[in-house]
Structure formats: C-alpha cells, structure tokens
Amino acid sequence: IYIKKINTLYLYANKAKETFKQYHQLLAFIENETFTSEILKQKQAEIKIENQKASEIFLQLSKILDAFDQRNNMIIGVFANSFALRDLHHCHRIEQWIDTYLEKVHSWFEVIAFFDAQNSLANFQFNHPNFTFPTIVDHTTSLKAENLGHPLIAQEKRITSSIIINNEEFFIITGANMAGKSTFLRTVSLAIVMSNIGLPVCATDFEYTPIKLITSMRTSDSLSDDESYFFSELKRLKYIVDAIKDQKYFIILDEILKGTNSTDKAKGSRKFVKKLVDFHATGIIATHDLSLCEVSEELSQVQNYYFDAEIVNEELYFDYSLKTGVCKNMN
C-alpha cells in the first residue's frame, strides 16, 4: 500500500545521498579549523546545535540513506521487508530527520557556500600578491586609480591607465575599433566589483567610494521573447534610468543605441547622457560618435577621453593608453 510513496522517497533520497556525504566532510573541515577572524568564527558557530555538530548530523543522514539504499539487495529487500518492514522503518527515520533539522539545513548550506566563496577570494589574493587592496574613501572622488589594468591580461602584455573620476562626473570615451575602449570599460567595471567584495585590484594604487555597478555593454535580441536588438537596448536603458532614481550607481555604457540609424543614435545618446547628468549620475560611456563629445561644451560634469590609433610603417598601431580629449583618428 505504501510502495509508491516509498519508491518516490527513495528516488529523492538516492539523489541526495552523495551530496550529504560530501557536505558532511566539508562541515567537518570547517568545524575543526581554528580561525582568528571574527566573521569566520561567527560563521563557524552557526553550524552547531547545543552539543551536536552539523557534520555529525549530516553523517547521520548519510548513514540512513546508505542503509535505505540496501533495499536493492535481493535478500535484504525481500526478507527484511517481509518480516521487519525495513523500508518503512528507514522512511520514518528519514522523515524524522527532516522534521528535526529542516530549518537548520538551509543555513548550514549557506555557511558552506560562504566558506567556499571566501576560500576562492583568498586564493585569488594569494595568487596575485602584486595587486593592491582598495582604500575606501568618502569624499568627492568616486574612483581614483594609478596604473589600472585588466587582471585577466598577462602582465607582460598589460597596458595600464590612470584615472580620476569625481562624484557626478561622466566620462565620454572615443576611439577607433580595437583601440581599447571596451577593454577599459571592463577593467573599470571589474575593479569596482572586485573592490566591493574585498578583493585586491590590478593597480598600484586604488581609492574609491563603495558604490553599486550598473552596465549596458552586451545587449542582445531575443527571438523567444520577440524582442529586437533596439528594443532590448531601450529596455536596458530604461532600467538604468529607473534604478538611479532610488540609489547611486556607477554607470558603464558601451556604444548605446547601436540598433538604430546614425542620426537617431546621435540624438538619442546625447539626450540620454544629459538625462544621466540631470540625475547627478557618475560613470563612463564609450562611443564612436564624435558629436557626443560636444556635450562637454554644455555640461561641465562631462569630460572627454580617448584611445588613439596611428598608422606606423603602413600598419595600424594602437598604444592602448587613455588620453584627455577627443579622438582624431578613427578607422
């Protein structure tokens, strides 16, 4: 009469068996470690219930699931169930364990995830001893970086740039294709995200005011959602405008309104930048549209920078260095 329910429980239990066996070992590592950091001690304390350890509780369930799995043995499956209702006994033990520890299990998984994340972050710092931990400031400077580079570019190939952007300033970056605009935007974005989670950044010196990041860099169309590329862009830009009404964000925009004609793109980009300035936004926009740089003549908050391209020995040459002003050589 209970065979269908027992089989359903066994199906789920069998999937979870190896997970609990592995997580029992992870919890044991956390419990047996000696930490000096207060936050790590606090997280370690969360995996204890009175005199019981979370690892022991997970091990207990793991053993129950192992025993339940023996129902596939012909002798145990037939004789033990015939005389001792073994499957029902193990189902009762599993459900009893769930009723007892259900509310705690979720928080224990979160503790494991926390230590896993911290371990990954610590490994990154260990592997990059030359990177710099950011200095948190609380004044007019939003971000100040010396020799800022992209952490995923090899050191021997990496070209760094220095930048100072104050609160409520907006940078317009122009440059030829392949000159380094998008890489620079990703570099700044990564530096902010890495700083926000406590990682060192690829720079010799880095000061910033902690701030959330919001971007529009790789918008795509969607056949399944019946959205054109242009409509997806508009949705993303509207999302950004709505977001900055309530909170401060550092905004990164890469070549917006690519889904429309050049005339509408120029007009729309100019109005959008002015809208962001009206909201006292801080950020960077990269563009091929040199006319957008004229906004700096109307608004003091807007600054122009560029990445240059030159013809050297009849070949296109990029130095990937950020310079003040408007790009003169476009490809």
Predicted regions: what they are:
Residues 1-176, 183-213, 235-236:
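Alpha-helical coupling/stalk and coiled-coil linker elements that connect catalytic or binding modules
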Residues 121, 127-331:
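ATPase nucleotide-binding head domains, primarily ABC-like/P-loop NTPase cores
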